[in-house]
Amino acid sequence: MLLIDKLSYRSKLRYVNASEKLMYAVLTLILCILSHSVRVAALVFVINGILTVGKGGIPLSRYIRLLMIPTAFLIAGTAAIVINISKVPMDAFALELGEWYITGSVEGLYLALELCATALSSVTCLYFLSLNTVMTDILDALRKLHFPALLTGLMLLVYRFIFVLFQPASAITVSQQARLGNRDFKTRVRSFGAMGSALFILALKRSNMLYDAMESRCYDGNIRVLTRMQPARAGEIAVIAAIELILVLVWICG
């Protein structure tokens, strides 16, 4: 079982109405992106952290570790905005290298800060949803919102095959490592190609078996999964509305 999936099953917010969590995550994500505000992004980051770690019971160390993944990509991506090579030094910093300067501007630094804050806060919205809601509940909420059945079915199948292929991939990796299949770059490439071809063949076999199993159970184009019904509560809806209102006010006043 994947880490995020395991944490979602253990979350204290798992049995909160999935449609409420989905709408909160989507609305907060939209506000965070549209506002282009560092204050709104910081507030979203803090609120989602409190909800996920404080209310959901997700371990803080795991949450921070998950946030480090997008943070690494953000740092690498925003480096091009901050760092410039020019013959003219800019107003933020300048490192002289002969006739050239490795330099940056205050405007570039602020733009990078805004971009990182917005992107990282947007990721926390998705983490809130994925760490506190199991996949079947998310798909059920999407169906209630009249999301196309074809897309929800594809999402469920892709989700299913991640688990189907993850275990064989792990076993193949361990087997290759035991046989020194990654001792240098050439053998790593060869081992990766062999694993890819083996997984491709396995995926075809498993997909045919899965389709035969669904056909034997009167598959009509829609995949139906039993979900535990959790009624929406007025108090939870009021909290969501209050949070969104606060974010809008911070956006307008900021």
Go through each PLM region and give its residues.
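Juxtamembrane/interface alpha-helical elements of multi-pass membrane proteins
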Residues: 66-182
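Hydrophobic transmembrane alpha-helix segments characteristic of membrane transport
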Residues: 44-51, 137-141
